[in-house]
């Protein structure tokens, strides 16, 4: 597909293929991997072998048939959040899928393990947001989820220049972020599990990008 040069941009900047003129998802020449959609999922798996427990956790999350590539934590501008069911229909088995993933595993009986992805979205959809990965021992869904959500929101707030107390608890910071008007939404996707059987248990939480 031919690229269209925008005269308002530096010569090295072009419209990424597939994006309409004026779209903010512009990238330097040759760098066109900007996701347009994302779906969130989570899962848990248990097996005598750690690797198999991980595979079963991916299966529970519905992403075991993908070649997953872990990336860092930026939520792209204008990226649309879709359901796990819709996302699964858009990715073919064996395809390479980029994701932000949190993973925790243990073989200790009665151990509580958790993995969580936090998300913070700016009010301006043309600005990028943040995703955070958190994995822990001894934390419930609520505790792990709040921690991940706090991290994502704090990173976004820092980028946007919103002043806040790093030592405040999540509820206090959440109010500051909402009042600022810069952060429109925060949420988390979390999987926790208490190990009840011998062998390994793995929990995963992930945000999977689609192009």
Task: Label the predicted regions.
Residues 2-211:
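Helix-coil modules at protein/domain termini and other flexible surface or pore-lining loops
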């Amino acid at each position: 597909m031919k690229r269209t040069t925008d005269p308002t941009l530096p010569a090295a900047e072009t419209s990424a293929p597939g994006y309409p003129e004026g779209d903010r998802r512009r990238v330097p020449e040759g760098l066109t991997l900007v996701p347009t959609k994302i779906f969130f999922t989570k899962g848990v798996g248990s097996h005598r072998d750690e690797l198999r427990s991980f595979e079963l956790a991916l299966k529970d999350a519905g992403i075991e048939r993908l070649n997953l590539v872990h990336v860092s934590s930026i939520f792209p501008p204008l990226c649309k959040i879709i359901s796990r069911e819709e996302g699964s229909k858009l990715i073919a088995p064996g395809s390479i899928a980029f994701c932000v993933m949190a993973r925790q595993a243990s073989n200790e009986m009665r151990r509580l393990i958790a993995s969580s992805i936090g998300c913070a979205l700016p009010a301006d959809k043309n600005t990028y947001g943040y995703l955070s990965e958190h994995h822990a021992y001894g934390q419930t869904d609520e505790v792990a989820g709040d921690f991940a959500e706090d991290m994502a929101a704090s990173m976004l707030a820092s980028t946007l220049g919103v002043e806040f107390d790093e030592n405040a608890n999540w509820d206090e910071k959440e109010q500051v972020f909402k009042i600022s008007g810069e952060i429109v939404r925060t949420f988390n996707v979390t999987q926790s599990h208490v190990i009840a059987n011998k062998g390994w248990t793995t929990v995963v939480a992930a945000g999977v990008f689609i192009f």
